[in-house]
Amino acid sequence: VLDGVDSHAGLADVAGDAGMVRVVDGGEGGVEGHRQARLGGGEGGLVVIDPGPDDPEHLAALVAAIGAAKVIAITCTHTHRDHSPAAAPLAALTGAPIIGCAPLVIESDEPRVDAPFDKSYTPDRVLADSEAISGPGWTLRAVATPGHTSNHICYALEETGALFTGDHVMAWSTSVVVPPDGDMADYMASLQKLHDREDRIYYPAHGPAVEKPRQLVRGM
């Protein structure tokens, strides 16, 4: 827990070697919960990955974790409501651009099990596969991984071998793939894409770090 921050805010160090600063859980659920965000960066500022839901308690914890640091960018792996809705209010508070996955486009009138996706998500810049944002000493590159959702992307922190996997690979469970937006063929192809990479460690949106990522992916 950070000095000077209420422990009930749920702040924890997770990955200093990956340039990560904190994981924030603004409410119940712990490390596997649905109110999370990841902050990474250094002296030049930080990047917020998956800022989480637009929940006042969660947003307050996130702002407390950021403190006086400059937010360079707010990024999202996909637009489910536990990942992206806090992007807009956080952008308004910090002035940082929203950069990352594309908005979710629904091309089907079928009933949806995962209907609570974020319809309000409006990025300032969409990252295509292999495009990157960077700062002093770091490069965060998009790795397109459709399957869990059609707009899902992971982020590779190239200098460290860390991959932020969103909901494509979770440490404590297999991901949910719900049609019509989720597609199992796409999901398996994206898993193979990750297996073919040489990332050293995964940081999922839910659950702890995966220290043997290729072994986990092979088992899926």
Predicted regions and their residues:
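Conserved beta-strand hairpin/beta-sheet module of binuclear metal-dependent hydrolase folds
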Residues: 22-70, 154-166
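Active-site HxH/HxHxD metal-binding segment of metal-dependent hydrolases
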Residues: 45-46, 53-139, 161, 171, ...
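Metallo-beta-lactamase
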Residues: 45-48, 53-55, 112-122, 132, ...
